Amino acid sequence: MAGIGAVALLLLNVFYGAVNIPMSSVWSILCGGSDTNASWRFIILESRLPQAITALLTGGALSVCGLMLQAVFRNPLADPSILGISSGSGLGVALVMLFFGGGISIGNLSFGGFAAVLAAAFVGAMLVTLLMFTLSGIIRSNAMLLIVGVMTGYLSSSVILLLNFFASADGVRAYMLWGMGNFASVSADRLPVFATVSVVCLITSVMLVKPLNVLVLGPQYARNLGINTRRLRNVILLVTGLLTALTTAFCGPIAFLGLAVPHIARLLLRTDDYRSLLPATILIGSIVALLCNFACVLPADGGVIPINAVTPIVGAPVIIYIMLRKHL
């Protein structure tokens, strides 16, 4: 049912938008018809369809990242941003937009615009991921590693604030727009790269269900069964870091999906069996992201709402409910 819901929402995102296109024409374009309006064809194939697929993949990616991090750190509030990966990505973008004037030059190689932002976001996120990956070999305690991640995030945020203070008004505005998040940055020509890396990482995460099922019983129990918990933690850090870097670089920092969706999946399935919980989390994350994306384009005449204005409306009540349920 969840899979059918995801497909239905994907089609809804393709059929509906700021420009009113007849349903028959949309369907004809999707089926390869050539007798439709050229501008409508461009809107569907170059904008709406890539945006819907991006929302589908990003929702699943960030949600499964949150689920795996919550399992590894045994912390229900762990999510991709808690390790400082999103902040590292934001720092990379801030350096390009606010310090380097929107472009990067390395020797004879120079590039600007979206390419510079994409490269900076990805490099920033992966540098933090590599830092956490390196520290995970030194720090044995998951709690201490979590604290280091939080402090890394605070440090990155502090540098970003300083850059904002000294930057131009145009630079600050550009950075704020990127920070609001959106799924429209992945155009049709960028989608294959985004989709390929996302799908490979999602398949890798599905392959981790058995060790995750053992890990949830406790690290000592997992070690007794022959699970190398440190190696498992490193693999999860690498996969979540890569997914977070990818989605943040292309879409900006998307809030609450990685934190809230795993709990929504647990509430619906009422199980901690990762064989069903992990695939369900990916599907529910995709559904929530598509719903949020659809909500963003509803006020078509007034423009598109930033995705981060909608995701907390979904995520915050879930977290509040979980916290209250544990204390009542």
Positions of the model-derived regions?
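Alpha-helical transmembrane segments in inner-membrane proteins
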Residues: 1-328
